[in-house]
Amino acid sequence: MIRKNTKTVNPARFQIEDLGSTGKVPTTFMKKEGYPMARVFNFGAGPAVLPVEVLEEAQKELLDFKGSGMSIMEHSHRGKEYDAVHAEAIDNVRKLLKISDDYTVLFVQGGASMQFAMVPLNLLGAGQTADYVDSGAWAGKAIKEAKLVGNVAIIANTGKDIPTRMPKNEDLKVTPGAAYVHITSNETIAGSQWKVFPKTAAPLVADMSSDILSRPFDINQFGLIYAGAQKNLGPSGVALVVMRKDLADRVPAKVPTMLKYQTYIKENSLYNTPPTFGIYILALVTRWMLKLGPEALYKQNVDKAARIYAALDSSAFYKGTAVKEFRSDMNITFRLPSEALEETFIKDASKLGMKGLKGHRDVGGIRASIYNAFPVAGVDALVAFMKEFEKKNG
């Protein structure tokens, strides 16, 4: 049975000594928090932390899936055992996003990077223009791919703004008759996030790889959303696509079979062998989300981010890199007074079992990625460490 773990640690009582100095969080502390063994707090941007409850369930079923005598990795994707997993994964996503029959749920290999090409290949017709918002590195990658396919208009550009931010909705200069409008809901490198999605006449398309199912939103506002699984949904290797069915009719005739959304719709994402184990874990993760409850998960995500931002805002030693209005709840980015101090911060945190805090290689600094499954205890550990580090080095 997948269990909930929503315990928190009072930062005022949390001591750095609780973490030890072995590079893992001690078993005694982890057991107190409801975990079975010593583990690290994984602040990595992705592949990212998974719920321990899910890992335990997968471990239990790894050799013998539901009494079948085989691992789910060994089962045929046409068999009844995997069919039940596939159906649950789709059903869970539908429930979490409250998806109507006007939309289809697809699982596609190639991650979100494949979607950078598939979206324009399927939705951008000859002579049409696709509108893109350049909000940072990941939006830039989507734009680069779309330009290989057809006409692209950049309708807002905050990609190089310092401090980092998203554009305001009123600043979007949408092209009349645009095939679609593409946004990136959360920029993991920049640490910025859309808080209110724009309303557009053209179908709104969003790369939600790093904040999918972290907060409530109306799926009916979008023509298509996509997300690589490895941050909030499961392991790498599969992308979730949710799209309005009528948009699949736009696809030009010469798009290759495996790049057509119609192929995945007609074959229930089973045209070829899908990443069965990745979809199995996705089914477990979304089951965990349903048990916890989307609203409770959202409140916990906001609370986790608020704790770290409060530590940043109360300090002259640390400096956040994103405009407050657009701060990400998933990826918290900040700087220290010098790169040397940042290197020491990362090294010392790692010794205490806090891994993955190094900022992206293109921008440096510190990045704490606290996706859905990241425990509150890890946030409180980081805050306690930040205060201790400032005392010693400020």
Which residues fall in each region the model found?
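Conserved PLP-anchoring active-site segment centered on the Schiff-base-forming lysine
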Residues: 124-140
